[in-house]
């Protein structure tokens, strides 16, 4: 802004509040946030990829893969992007198996391997026979699923090489 920019694009999750704060102080600059928000300002707008479609398709695959209809989802936090993923995944699974249920464990963190592993273990031990995840650290979940023979879905990274026997797919922005 100090260099004369009239458009600012904020691309990082977690920058929403800061972007809105700066937008309110600079009404002559247009701010564009890549994410979800219900905030509305004359110089502030949001956009997010339509991730519900690929999550719905992954849910359909999960519905075809699961023998029990009990699906697990390791999620970071109940923020809009994550909730869209969970709901779309479950609706897709229910398209195939009307009785499918998605059991969710929120870790409260994006990148805590220990919490992610604990959450995946909890879901598997409760009878979930397919696991999906929305975490920034997929490796511990994928490794656990590979060792347990549990089909797994990912988010934002194709890590098929880590779990060639159980990897199904991932939702990745391209």
Residue positions per predicted region:
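A residue-level marker of the well-folded mature domains of exported/periplasmic proteins
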Residues: 1-174
């Amino acid at each position: 802004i100090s260099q004369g920019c009239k458009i600012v694009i904020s691309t990082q999750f977690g920058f929403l509040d800061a972007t809105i704060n700066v937008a309110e102080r600079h009404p002559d600059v247009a701010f564009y946030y890549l994410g979800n928000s219900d905030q509305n300002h004359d110089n502030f707008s949001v956009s997010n990829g339509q991730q519900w479609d690929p999550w719905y398709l992954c849910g359909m695959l999960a519905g075809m893969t699961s023998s029990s209809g009990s699906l697990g989802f390791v999620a970071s936090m109940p923020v809009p992007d994550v909730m869209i993923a969970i709901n779309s995944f479950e609706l897709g699974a229910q398209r195939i198996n009307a009785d499918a249920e998605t059991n969710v464990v929120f870790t409260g963190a994006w990148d805590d391997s220990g919490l992610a592993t604990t959450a995946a273990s909890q879901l598997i031990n409760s009878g979930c026979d397919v696991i999906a995840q929305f975490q920034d650290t997929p490796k511990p979940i994928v490794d656990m699923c590979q060792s347990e023979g549990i089909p797994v879905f990912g988010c934002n990274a194709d890590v098929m090489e880590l779990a060639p026997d159980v990897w199904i797919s991932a939702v990745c922005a391209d």
